[in-house]
From Swiss-Prot:
Keywords of the record: Cytoplasm, Ribonucleoprotein, Ribosomal protein
Localization terms from the record: Cytoplasm
GO MF: RNA binding; structural constituent of ribosome
Annotated TM spans: none
Signal peptide: none
Pfam families reported for this sequence: Ribosomal_L3
UniProt family annotation: Belongs to the universal ribosomal protein uL3 family.
Gene Ontology biological-process entries: translation
One Gene Ontology CC term in the entry: cytosolic large ribosomal subunit
Keyword DNA repair assigned: no
Taxonomic lineage of the native organism: Eukaryota, Fungi, Fungi incertae sedis, Microsporidia, Unikaryonidae
Protein name: Large ribosomal subunit protein uL3
InterPro entries (UniProt xref): L3_arc_euk (IPR045077), Ribosomal_L3_dom_3_arc_sf (IPR044892), Ribosomal_uL3 (IPR000597), Ribosomal_uL3_CS (IPR019926), Transl_B-barrel_sf (IPR009000)
Organism: Encephalitozoon cuniculi (strain GB-M1)
Length: 383
């Protein structure tokens, strides 16, 4: 024990206390970007489903004193499938001395079954009464109230999980997303014109833009202190356990402090990650190619993403990892920080090899050209 240090930094961050399970699997955005009324009316968020990860090769340009250098960098990226969202309601908030207060909601004439399932479950009576949210003069009076008294306007949107076969979801995920830009009346008219209509992810975000991701991490269950906080294991000769904290506090105060590493829930926490760079926005049904890699191929790897499948709808590619398991809903939001002029984004290569093993080929045609014709293919041609 001669080399033992008697002082060390604490293990585990106290930033995310308490470490408990999230209330919902789709956490709402707690804040939205500041409203700039000089800009055109636009939406500030979107919902997508995590598909999986791959990697890309891009060119980075560095400017030195007398020369300009460029080198290739490989980045890990996350692909999220984002089918178009549907607007089914409008809500306004007025400013009071105690904060924002919600005004009456204006809903569309038709609300899909996915929204009713999410709001009322399978209770038939509730769904019948919910089909008459507001109609006629009631809606008109509520719209006028929002125009006169609202400080900010948000729209009620729903996802379309039935477009993704691998999810097996009937309940749509619903959320409130703020509308920024323009005056209050312009925002209300913009929202009224998009009731019961789809909004694509390309209308909200752009390539080379920084966004925030809000989601729930993978759940790990009840774990000990070594895995949960990363504390050091005790020596082999220790009594009454090795994977535990040796001293949990002083004699007085005669209680265990909250800052002591203890066993408990790990994972399934709500987390917000800021300034994720958007690398690509496209559609899974169309092929992609770059200026350097002219091979046309789908965004899905060979065999599909493990435990997810193939991406067939709109998708967004984000640099780095995104919290949560595959098939989990993630809320994307425009960055709260001021956008800075970033470097030019030049993607040279997108990897689409199989993620099930050590993939060698980018497309099935490339694999067939390498191995040649199979017996099954020859037999199929004969018959």
């Amino acid at each position: 024990m001669s080399c033992r240090k008697f002082n060390a930094p604490r293990h585990g961050s106290l930033q995310f206390c308490p470490r408990k399970r999230s209330k919902t699997i789709r956490p709402a955005a707690g804040a939205f970007p500041a409203d700039d009324r000089s800009q055109p009316v636009h939406l500030t968020g979107f919902m997508a489903y995590k598909a999986g990860m791959t990697h890309v090769v891009r060119t980075k340009t560095q400017v030195a004193k007398n020369k300009q250098l460029s080198r290739e960098i490989m980045d890990a990226v996350t692909v999220l499938e984002a089918p178009p969202m549907v607007v089914y309601g409008i809500v306004g908030y007025e400013k009071t001395v105690t904060g924002l207060r919600r005004l009456p909601i204006v809903t569309a004439a038709y609300v899909s079954d996915g929204v009713l399932r999410r709001m009322f479950g399978n209770r038939y009576a509730s769904k019948e009464s919910a089909g008459q949210f507001c109609k006629g003069s009631v809606c008109e009076s509520r719209v006028e109230m929002i125009k006169e008294r609202a400080h900010c306007v948000r729209v009620l949107v729903q996802t379309q999980p039935t477009l993704i076969k691998g999810l097996g979801l009937k309940k749509a995920h619903i959320a409130e997303i703020q509308v920024n830009g323009g005056s209050i009346s312009e925002k209300v008219e913009w929202a009224l014109g998009r009731l019961e209509k789809e909004i694509a992810i390309g209308e909200v975000f752009g390539v080379n833009e920084n966004i925030d991701t809000i989601g729930v991490t993978k759940g790990k269950g009840f774990q000990g202190t070594v895995k949960r906080f990363g504390v050091r294991k005790q020596p082999r000769k220790s009594r009454k356990g090795i994977r535990k904290v040796a001293c949990i506090g002083a004699w007085h105060p005669s209680r265990v402090m909250y800052s002591i590493a203890r066993a408990g829930q790990m994972g399934f926490h709500r987390r917000t990650e800021k300034n994720k760079r958007v690398y690509m926005i496209g559609n899974g049904s169309s092929n992609i190619k770059t200026e350097f890699d002219l091979t046309e191929k789908p965004i899905s790897p060979m065999g599909g993403f493990p435990h997810y499948g193939e991406v067939r709808n709109d998708f967004i590619m984000v640099k780095g990892a995104v919290v949560g398991a595959r098939k989990r809903v993630v809320t994307l939001r425009k960055s709260l920080l001021r956008q800075r002029a970033g470097e030019e984004l030049v993607i040279k290569f997108v990897d689409t090899s199989s993620k099930i093993g050590h993939g060698r080929f980018q497309t099935s045609a490339e694999k067939k050209a390498f191995y040649g014709a199979r017996k099954a293919d020859i037999a199929a041609e004969i018959h």
